[in-house]
Amino acid sequence: MLKRVFLSLLVLIGLLLLTVLGLDRWMSWKTAPYIYDELQDLPYRQVGVVLGTAKYYRTGVINQYYRYRIQGAINAYNSGKVNYLLLSGDNALQSYNEPMTMRKDLIAAGVDPSDIVLDYAGFRTLDSIVRTRKVFDTNDFIIITQRFHCERALFIALHMGIQAQCYAVPSPKDMLSVRIREFAARFGALADLYIFKREPRFLGPLVPIPAMHQVPEDAQGYPAVTPEQLLELQKKQGK
């Protein structure tokens, strides 16, 4: 009896792993036509969306994923592949501001501040992609991130009827742990899209691109997110 239960458990685990692997491969296959590894092959679009991540690890070492995304954004902008850069990242806490950090580094690299737009409510990939259309009134854009992230972001875009392509910037050599976490992230994205039908945490007023944008001088300022929405989030975070 115990042996039968053990074998059944092994079969169940095996089927689950095969399902997760199959869904992972399906997502990669479905989005492959929209991913560009070479800048010269990338089509022109008015807006490039840079997906945020932390600049530094907790150890203080610079995050290579961040570095490659910023360099990719600089290359796409300087080559004329995009005219505007929408920096979408997490700013749920006043002490952590992904869009502002990206903005400072891009300006230091020569990007015109007037060509930079900030999205402080890109808490998840789904938020960033859907808000680009529903808040920033842009339905055809270039996503800038690593290939594995391109696949998930594009899958969300395709499901939502959003026309997007992705510029796949390099990944660090040692990315095994990140790739393993990506399995869970993709499974979560599928659940969000097909089961929970999730929308972005915040939407907010329409902020078309191009337009005149108020750019804050410090880590404050939350365009396209109302103060009431941010207060609600900070209460949930216990801040």
UniProtKB/Swiss-Prot annotation:
A Pfam family that the UniProt record links to this protein: DUF218
Entry GO terms, CC: plasma membrane
The entry's keywords: Cell inner membrane, Cell membrane, Membrane, Transmembrane, Transmembrane helix
Periplasmic face of the membrane: 24-239
Membrane topology summary: Single-pass membrane protein
Domain of life: Bacteria
CDD domains: YdcF-like (cd06259)
Segments on the Cytoplasmic side according to the record's topology features: 1-6
InterPro entries noted in UniProt: Cell_Envelope_Assoc, DUF218, Uncharacterised_SanA
Main location: membrane
Subcellular localization(s) per the UniProt record: Cell inner membrane
Membrane-crossing segments per the record: 7-23
Protein task: Participates in the barrier function of the cell envelope.
Name of the molecule in the record: Protein SanA
Organism the protein comes from: Escherichia coli (strain K12)
Gene name of the encoded protein: sanA
